[in-house]
Amino acid sequence: DKYQQAGIEHFFFGQIDNPLSPTCCPELIGFHSLTDSAVTLQAIAKQDAQDKTGNIVQMDGRIQMIEYTEMPPQLAKQITPDGQLNFWAANIAVHIFKTSFLKQLAQDPTALPFHTAHKTVAHIDQLGNQIHPTEPNAIKFERFIFDSLSVSPKTTVIEADRNFVFAAVKNHAAASFNTVDTCQQAISALHRNWLIAAGVQVDMDITVEIDPYWARNAQQVGERPDLPQTIKTDIFLTSSRSTAR
């Protein structure tokens, strides 16, 4: 009600620790508006059948989501004749909703089903001792916003390049992807590409980071009056100055 009273027709929702999440991306909002969708979400191609991402699928003529914990392994590993994953579309938790659709969901307490999640929960036993179990010992009931797809009158899925929109931090440092290090590398690579597109000569083996107050996308980088011509050392471009590290 508050959003509708303020004249807000669309609501962006991004819910995971992904610094590359394209908040209120103009192109995504444009597709959402042009298609007159109740829900628009962004997808990327999965790196592996066992990626810990939701699977965007079509069931009974509707776009729906199957959480990776609920996806049978034999289905996740299905391959098409050309060798690609059959269920390739990964949800990265980037959504745009019509506020009128969200209002409908809020008015129906049964619109979103419950999911069970097995959790490892510390607790105090009958003797007052604090117990820290190593195996799941509790069941948590959860609701997920992506289940709204099953009742959405119209849903649009937009595929994006992983390198431009997704660098989540989900794994420990020893993992090969979705770590703090791979996230920092992805941010630097994206910002380097923005600078190169704007005509800046940037060494490929340095770290580059751009403060969002300095520029939020490649277009804004190209419009900066203080854009450097060359960058040869690690740099953090801020709203006030360019700081060499």
Regions found by a protein language model. Name each.
Residues 2-3, 7-12, 20-201:
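Catalytic core of tubulin tyrosine ligase-like
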Residues 16:
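Short acidic donor-binding/metal-coordinating loop in glycosyltransferase active sites
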Residues 193, 200-203, 208, 213:
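Metallocofactor- and cofactor-centric catalytic cores in central/energy metabolism, strongly enriched
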Residues 211-245:
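C-terminal non-catalytic accessory extensions
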